[in-house]
Amino acid sequence: MRIRIVVANQAEAAFYDLDSRTGEPKFATRLTDPLAHLHDRDLKSDRPGRFSDHALLSPGRRGATAHHGTGGERRPRKHEAEVFARQVAGQLEHAQRNAEFDRLVVMAAPPFLGVLRKVLPDSVRLHVAAEVGKDLVNQPPASVRAHMPPDVLSELPAVV
């Protein structure tokens, strides 16, 4: 049995494999989102679009134009986190299709965990053994292993 561990926040995701109860997670790959470090003002390209509409005005007001916004403001950081979560989910779906893991443990910063949970495909969600709401992206593999739920570790063989 092989467990894939994804350790993520809104800017980075590290993927590890664990195949024994006593072993240390082995690094598999990493995804980064360089846009996650930008400020909201740097992520926004412009104000929301605007359009004109003559039909909304009363018939007696010739030549007048009404201007309307195309929608409410969208928070750029939240949007960027959703885009990155879809990339992480896509990576997990690809790995699951290629039978690279049997079980999945998701360790993510609490706000990002919720975003990631929403975008995980059902085919991947079926393999989720546990979720840990902690940002461990910059921690060494030994620390990642220390945060593994004991019941998930007990599913692994003692040695490989």
Provide a role label for each language-model segment.
Residues 1-160:
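Terminal alpha-helical anchor/extension segments at protein ends
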